[in-house]
Swiss-Prot record:
Region (Disordered): 64-119
Organism in which the protein naturally occurs: Nostoc sp. (strain PCC 7120 / SAG 25.82 / UTEX 2576)
Record-given protein name: Uncharacterized low temperature-induced protein all0459
Biased composition (Polar residues): 95-104
Length: 119
């Protein structure tokens, strides 16, 4: 018990600094998300065109009879899948555009070789 009283008496002069640091930390951690709001302002109609086209296709499929295997294969071969078609095809990762990328396994092996010094 005497150790606690000695430790508390030693911390008494820096108690103000600890409280001030804690208050500053709480204040800054609550204001950082507010700064993130102004970092990127998107247009209100930026992605609505693609969404409207997808919604139209979805409504048409919902109103019609279920498609057969041939129709589904034909539609899915037009793009990434039956629903998306070719929307945002350049933004999607697929084998055709990711041949030059390195695998996670290769990255880990290179990292371990660097750490252990083996080449």
């Amino acid at each position: 018990m005497k150790i606690f009283s000695v430790a508390l008496s030693m911390l008494r002069p820096v108690r103000f600094l600890i409280v001030a640091f804690t208050c500053a930390l709480l204040f800054l951690s609550s204001t950082v998300p507010a700064f993130a709001i102004s970092s990127y302002q998107s247009e209100p109609t930026e992605a609505t065109d693609q969404l409207l086209e997808t919604q139209k296709a979805t409504d048409e499929v919902a109103r019609s009879a279920p498609l057969g295997l041939k129709e589904v294969q034909k539609k899915s071969n037009e793009g990434l899948n039956e629903v998306q078609g070719a929307a945002d095809i350049n933004k999607q990762k697929r084998p055709a555009n990711s041949q030059d990328s390195s695998s996670v396994e290769g990255d880990i092996q290179n990292f371990l070789e660097k750490v252990t010094g083996k080449n």
